[in-house]
Amino acid sequence: MIYIGLPQWSHPKWVRLGITSLEEYARHFNCVEGNTTLYALPKPEVVLRWREQTTDDFRFCFKFPATISHQAALRHCDDLVTEFLTRMSPLAPRIGQYWLQLPATFGPRELPALWHFLDSLPGEFNYGVEVRHPQFFAKGEEEQTLNRGLHQRGVNQVILDSRPVHAARPHSEAIRDAQRKKPKVPVHAVLTATNPLIRFIGSDDMTQNRELFQVWLQKLAQWHQTTTPYLFLHTPDIAQAPELVHTLWEDLRKTLPEIGAVPAIPQQSSLF
């Protein structure tokens, strides 16, 4: 099994694809990257509506709120964690994983706080961690310590692949904005648990995206044997994200013919 989705479930330009709600999005994709929870908790009635609009086969991968990962830096935040998990509890059977997106200021010295935080989390969920500090990508003791600690706890490494967007010509504001905001970190495809999460940050050049994605075809074919990967596809202008899925899917299908149920992705070429 492999889960493939986008960073969000609606966009004005997706109306032409028949995607205007979470319910309609879930007819095409089997998971979504939950970016909204980084910035604010949804209201209880909104969480219930999300449950009503999906089935038990769908998976949410929500980010921990920034109040936990950034402001508190994982310290003295038990009440915030409880509030977050309680708020999202109606969706508990559909949680693919909760994951931390740590800022670049969170370095090796902060690892004890990360271990304490992860060790205090409830055991019924899968978890992931995305790091951005340069030392965690230097192939030294700091990176080894991080990977070893995640592996020991069964926590997934969230892998950011921003090569496409940083290789793109900065010919649009969307590209320039993404190049400013998306970290430019090395891609180390390290497996630390059973649900590796890949965030592929494409550009608006679909030919280039396809070329740079080739490395993931081999890796996903390998990981798919023993794990359940999550693949989230981004574009600088998120309106083009379904087109990126369509661009890459043929190669995915050739590489992983046995992956089972796949998103019923509409044809994009005439729409963008």
UniProtKB/Swiss-Prot annotation:
It comes from the Bacteria. Pfam families: DUF72. NCBIfam families: PRK10302.1 (NF007637). Belongs to the UPF0759 family. PANTHER family: UNCHARACTERIZED PROTEIN YECE, UPF0759 PROTEIN YECE. This is UPF0759 protein YecE. It comes from Escherichia coli O157:H7. The lineage of its organism: Bacteria, Pseudomonadati, Pseudomonadota, Gammaproteobacteria, Enterobacterales.
